């Protein structure tokens, strides 16, 4: 497990949802990463009596999230991804009708937005799904991070059945940058080499 992120901070502070950001033992190995997620479920169940979970995966992280969603239909209440890959994501076909949120930068140079468009189609019909492409944005959604975090917080809250917590003030706060949020995002992306292959950050907004 790793330290908190801006989204995790918002979930904890604004709607009191216990959150874990995983540092996978073997990154890019879907089966092992899926086992890590299951272990995190068990930890949260033991520590906080959590029974329902929403998974959020970034880039490769979409793969183990969809895998676990297929394996745990009772515990996983929804899945959201940011700039997901399509390799090893067949579990998305078993997610329906549980809700799905796909976010992607239209100018992503690491994994093109066509990946999320493909996942949107593979989810099928009959469930609740949303695809949002951010024009001019990159693999880390660096130009629209606060808005993306707000969308994720609202999605997670609704998927957990906690809509009553989404008052206007909470939603407004979810769309703001917390102290050092930008710097934290940059550090995490650089650590994971997610700004390579020509990617760059642009905070001119």
What do these predicted ranges mean?
Residues 1-16:
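Short, surface-exposed "cap/lid" segments of acyl-processing enzymes
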Residues 39-97:
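Primarily recognizes the serine-hydrolase "nucleophile elbow" in alpha/beta-hydrolase
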Residues 112-122, 146:
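Short alpha-helix in the alpha/beta-hydrolase fold that links the catalytic acid
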Residues 122-140:
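Catalytic histidine neighborhood in serine/cysteine hydrolases
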Residues 137-149, 173:
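Catalytic histidine-centered segment of alpha/beta-hydrolase-like enzymes
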